[in-house]
From Swiss-Prot:
GO molecular function: 2-succinyl-5-enolpyruvyl-6-hydroxy-3-cyclohexene-1-carboxylic-acid synthase activity; magnesium ion binding; manganese ion binding; thiamine pyrophosphate binding
Gene: menD
EC primary class: transferase
NCBIfam families per the UniProt record, alphabetical: menD
Protein name, entry field: 2-succinyl-5-enolpyruvyl-6-hydroxy-3-cyclohexene-1-carboxylate synthase
Gene Ontology biological process terms from the UniProt entry: menaquinone biosynthetic process
Annotated catalysed reactions: isochorismate + 2-oxoglutarate + H(+) = 5-enolpyruvoyl-6-hydroxy-2-succinyl-cyclohex-3-ene-1-carboxylate + CO2
Keywords attached to this entry: Magnesium, Manganese, Menaquinone biosynthesis, Metal-binding, Thiamine pyrophosphate, Transferase
Length: 541
């Protein structure tokens, strides 16, 4: 049985490699022993394989997500049986909601140990339910040539499914009996027949666009697949582009900070479009979608997963890559389009920010071209959307699928592990607290990441929400002050610590060379931050 396990596991690994997978994140455990050992041996023999070990499965899931999001390719998670696999759930949920390909290899107890009180045993087949595109079971210890052929085929099939739009996670469950030790240092002739899955070619007949005033809303663009086409299209046709901070579109022709402009009531009737074409996922600004609906503006949604619209406002969903749409669109625009475009580009911009917002403008000035920036949810991503300009060479990421605050540190470290230059994470203290364990990967792998922590002592975003209208219970239930010492967190993980007294000093820290992770703390107050935001809005009105 050991020989069969060894041989079939090698086929499993080779099939994953043939499917384009190069990154594996392992969380140690007993039941996953044969896969982990043979994977380590495989990685030693193949320098294309990158193997990371993360002792915390929850962190590992998001570390893998960060790599997959950055490289736009599937990443493997390997974990042991029981609740360990369930710890991947938050990352799988984010991968599902954000269309990120993940491959979960869940090792399991054999069928005779199921449902009878065996330790470290839970029902694992299809554990993630609707969050995975497919869940399959492979019995690596079954001795039959058909099983080996099945492994070769099914692994390639489900990995291909994970990268087929809409992309998403898949699970391969692997029940294993003892003995679990494989045969190492054995030369096996492992040949996996590569399967080529051709993409379905669909000729979509686009309706001609006739509009007096056309506007494009560029939403999150993880693939960075349409920026060049959008630039050519917008300049050629004088079409204004509202660019979400995650759209990767940062040019002179793009309009940023739409949320703050809408709050300042700067969008009047002259700026109302006849047609809006939306690209990508849901934008950071909820206000812009609300505006489209309240003003009853004709809206199309173009995306490989088009039709995902929680506002239920779009009138046409075109399942098509935005790049292809832009290349094949037929336009008949009126002479008013030039004037319309100019009015949008002439909208006032925020010229003075305060306090926490100054961190964004300081970051804007400090980060060099080609920098990868990961942004936490809640206030950081909203402030980035409103106040960061940057340029088109910089890549900005966030976990905006399920929009949770968990796993952000690990996701950013995963990003940092696969890019060549230093990267940056912008986060709050509560998000840091949620994923402190992720810092172990920074310690173990010496990853070049600058973590900027805006410490306003708790859940700052609630100060902007209706909950702030219940002051008697606000701090207890929503403000939730943590009162944690960020420097001691840095000391615990042997990370360099810097206290930022004024935002303008950020540039000097970021420009100081370092090959490891740094924790940069800026202390703030969420009540003051709320007041500062209101004053900035008043100045814009």
């Amino acid at each position: 049985m050991t020989d069969t396990l060894t041989f079939n596991t090698k086929h499993l690994l080779e099939a994953l490699f043939e499917s384009g997978i190069r990154h594996f994140i392992v969380s140690p455990g007993s039941r996953s022993t044969p896969i982990a050992l043979l994977l380590a041996e495989y990685a030693e023999q193949n320098n294309e394989i990158k193997l990371f070990v993360d002792v915390d499965e929850r962190s590992a899931g998001f570390f893998a997500l960060g790599i997959a999001k950055t490289l736009l390719e599937p990443v493997v998670l390997l974990g042991t049986s029981g609740t360990a696999i369930a710890e991947y759930m938050p990352a799988v949920a984010e991968a599902y909601a954000a269309n990120i390909p993940l491959v979960v290899l869940s090792t399991d107890r054999p069928q005779e140990l199921q449902f009878n009180g065996a330790p470290q045993t839970i029902p694992q087949s299809n554990l993630f339910g609707q969050l995975t595109k497919q869940a399959v079971l492979i019995r690596l210890q079954d001795m039959h040539s058909d099983v080996t052929e099945y492994i070769d085929f099914i692994v390639q099939k489900v990995v291909n499914l994970s990268i087929t739009a809409p992309r998403g996670p898949i699970q391969i469950n692997l029940p294993l009996r003892k003995p679990l030790m494989p045969v190492l240092d054995r030369q096996d002739e492992v040949h996996v027949q590569r399967v080529v899955f051709d993409k379905q070619s669909v000729q979509y007949r686009l309706p001609p666009i006739t509009a007096k005033r056309l506007l494009i809303l560029a939403g999150p663009n993880v693939l960075n697949s349409y920026d060049d086409s959008l630039k050519k299209f917008a300049i050629k046709n004088n079409v204004p582009v509202i660019a979400d901070v995650l759209s990767q579109s940062r040019h002179t022709y793009t309009i940023h900070g739409i949320d703050v402009l809408l709050q300042a009531h700067k969008i009047n009737a002259d700026l109302k479009p006849d047609l809006v074409v939306r690209f990508g996922k849901t934008p950071v600004s909820a206000r812009v979608l609300q505006w489209l609906k309240e003003e009853n503006i004709l809206t199309w949604h173009v995306d490989e997963d088009a039709g995902v619209d929680h506002t239920r406002h779009i009138v046409r969903a075109i399942k098509m890559a935005p790049h292809d749409f832009l290349e094949s669109m037929h336009l008949t625009l009126s002479k008013n389009q030039i004037d319309f475009n100019q009015k949008w580009l002439s909208l006032p911009k925020v010229i003075k920010t305060r306090n926490e917002m100054n961190i964004i403008t300081a970051l804007d000035d400090a980060v060099p071209d080609d920098t990868h920036i990961f942004v936490a949810n809640s206030m950081p991503i909203r402030d980035m959307d409103n106040f960061f300009t940057g340029n088109h060479t910089q890549r900005i990421y966030a976990n905006r699928g399920a929009n949770g605050i968990d796993g952000v540190i690990s996701s950013a470290l995963g990003m940092s592990a696969v890019v060549k230059q230093r990267s940056v994470l912008l986060t709050g203290d509560l998000t840091l607290f949620h994923d402190m364990n992720g810092l172990m990967m920074a310690k173990n792998y010496q990853l070049p990441l600058d973590i900027i922590v805006i410490n306003n002592n708790g859940g700052g975003i609630f100060s902007f929400l209706p909950q702030a209208g219940a002051p008697k219970y606000f701090e207890q239930l929503f403000g939730t002050p943590l009162n944690i010492d960020i420097k001691k967190i840095a000391d615990l993980y042997y990370i360099d610590y810097h206290q930022l007294n004024v935002p303008e000093a950020l540039s000097q820290i970021l420009q100081t060379p370092s090959k490891t992770t740094r924790l940069i703390e800026y202390k703030s107050d969420h009540q003051r931050n709320r007041d500062d935001h209101r004053e900035v809005l008043e100045m814009l009105k």
